[in-house]
């Protein structure tokens, strides 16, 4: 009986040729009758099936892939080397020597830093071996990647004849500032940097302006500038900065800087209009429109109430704190009126008694204006501070503390009222013009959330 584990033919098949011819069909039938699997591979590439004729028992044989002569076949292909072909055959000592002596242009030896990292080096060990600090290593590697992206004709379309501009020692610092932009923006920003001979600090300002321009949509004057022009993006960033300046001279200076770079005619006209208003105010002249009314462009920038930004730990360090009920802007006036009022306070033990239960509370420092209105004060939570009637630069939540006992509208005040089911903040002057004599509450103070002193990405990269 034939065993599947034995690849050799039956002994009877090796005696004589005639006997082999008579027993061969039986041998095939025996082999097929004892197979339970659907197919079995035989030595030499043959196979048999559980059903069908002899032609169905053989599967097509595909030889395994063969490696080139002298090379081991490896199904896994490692990622391509970051080194150019001219540097791939260098040993470790030669690579370190090139970095140590800064041999060649910076973008030629910058890939060696990445290759050393793959070989197990860290920034500290590379600095010890080559003298290149970790910050400079990061700058060289990132700048090299930015430079390579400029060479991509499909995405960047950057003229190759302009690339030698960045071959100088200051080239890595300039290209490093473009790391947050996409390939198209990098090409446009690089052309602008070359045209205006910008230093790294100026390129950083340009890159941040181009990155932030889409997020500033909806702000006053935004539609007059073009997003496709790096100069217009930079001009609008300076135009926007001028509207946040407190001193009128600082405002004029920012607008003059914006006028130096603005490219489109609509953007230039908008900057010139704002610059004329600022210069009139600096000269002490009142700007009057055709109907004889005072221009409120500058006045609209002033809040009219105290606006404070909390510091981290300020509540914990405060001598006294005040607990106030909180309502959302979508809750409406009914919820604001139903918020609890303070009934009794134990100053010694800090126990506060209110007239009803409430779910959301805010703890703020015991500022004087808030303490005076604490009995009837309520906190209105706004999801976006840019909805306030004055100009705010950041999209951030704010807390509006209002006194419900003061509802009469005066032109100098700021008030909370309901419009289309939402709580909004409006100036008293605007409400008086609309004939509104009473509001839901008068704004006492506006609280902005804590913020780091420098909210941008650190200019230095740590090891």
Curated annotation (Swiss-Prot):
Residues 1-31 form a transit peptide. GO terms for biological process: ribulose bisphosphate carboxylase complex assembly. Residues 1-84 are annotated as: Disordered. Residues 83-275 are annotated as: N-terminal alpha-helix. Residues 1-18 have a biased composition (Low complexity). GO terms for cellular component: chloroplast. It comes from the Eukaryota. Residues 305-450 are annotated as: C-terminal beta sheet. It is found in: Plastid, Chloroplast. Keywords: Chaperone, Chloroplast, Coiled coil, Plastid, Transit peptide. The keyword Plastid applies. Disruption phenotype: Seedling lethal due to a lack of RuBisCO. Residues 19-33 have a biased composition (Basic residues). Expressed in bundle sheath. Residues 43-53 have a biased composition (Gly residues). Required for assembly or stability of RuBisCO. Acts at a postchaperonin step to fold and/or assemble the large subunit (LS) into RuBisCO. This is Rubisco accumulation factor 1, chloroplastic. It comes from Zea mays. The gene is RAF1.
């Amino acid at each position: 009986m034939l065993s599947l584990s034995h690849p050799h033919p039956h002994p009877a098949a090796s005696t004589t040729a005639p006997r082999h011819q008579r027993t061969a069909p039986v041998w095939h039938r025996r082999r097929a009758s004892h197979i339970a699997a659907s197919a079995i591979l035989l030595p030499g590439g043959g196979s048999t099936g559980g059903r069908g004729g002899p032609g169905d028992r053989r599967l097509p044989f595909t030889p395994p892939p063969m490696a080139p002569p002298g090379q081991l076949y490896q199904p896994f292909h490692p990622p391509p080397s970051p080194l150019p072909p001219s540097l791939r055959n260098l040993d470790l000592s030669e690579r370190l020597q090139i970095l140590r002596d800064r041999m060649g242009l910076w973008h030629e030896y910058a890939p060696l830093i990445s290759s050393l990292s793959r070989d197990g080096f860290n920034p500290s060990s590379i600095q010890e071996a080559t003298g290149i600090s970790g910050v400079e290593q990061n700058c060289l590697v990132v700048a090299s990647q930015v430079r390579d992206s400029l060479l991509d004709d499909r995405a960047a379309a950057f003229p190759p004849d302009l690339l030698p501009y960045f071959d100088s020692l200051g080239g890595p610092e300039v290209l490093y500032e473009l790391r947050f932009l996409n390939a198209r923006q990098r090409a446009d920003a690089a052309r602008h940097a070359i045209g205006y001979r910008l230093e790294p600090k100026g390129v950083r300002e340009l890159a941040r302006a181009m990155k932030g321009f889409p997020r500033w949509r909806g702000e006053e004057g935004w539609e007059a500038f073009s997003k496709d022009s790096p100069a217009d993006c930079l001009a609008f960033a300076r135009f926007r900065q001028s509207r946040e300046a407190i001193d009128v001279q600082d405002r004029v200076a920012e607008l003059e800087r914006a006028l130096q770079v603005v490219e489109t005619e609509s953007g230039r006209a908008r900057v010139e209009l704002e610059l004329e208003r600022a210069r009139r105010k600096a000269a002490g002249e009142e700007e009057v429109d055709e109907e004889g009314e005072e221009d409120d462009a500058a006045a609209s920038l002033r809040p009219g109430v105290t606006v404070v930004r909390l510091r981290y730990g300020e509540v914990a360090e405060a001598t006294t704190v005040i607990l106030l009920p909180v309502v959302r802007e979508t809750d409406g006036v009914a919820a604001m009126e139903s918020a609890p009022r303070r009934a009794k306070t134990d100053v010694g033990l800090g126990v506060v008694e209110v007239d009803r239960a409430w779910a959301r509370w805010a703890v703020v420092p015991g500022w004087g204006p808030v303490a005076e209105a604490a009995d009837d004060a309520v906190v209105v939570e706004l999801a976006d501070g840019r909805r306030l009637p004055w100009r705010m630069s950041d999209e951030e939540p704010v807390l509006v503390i209002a006194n419900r006992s003061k509802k009469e509208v005066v032109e100098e005040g700021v008030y909370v009222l309901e419009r289309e089911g939402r709580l909004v903040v409006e100036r008293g002057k605007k409400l008086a013009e609309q004939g509104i004599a009473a509001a839901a509450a008068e704004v006492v103070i506006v609280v902005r959330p804590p913020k780091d002193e420098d909210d941008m990405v650190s200019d230095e990269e740590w090891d």
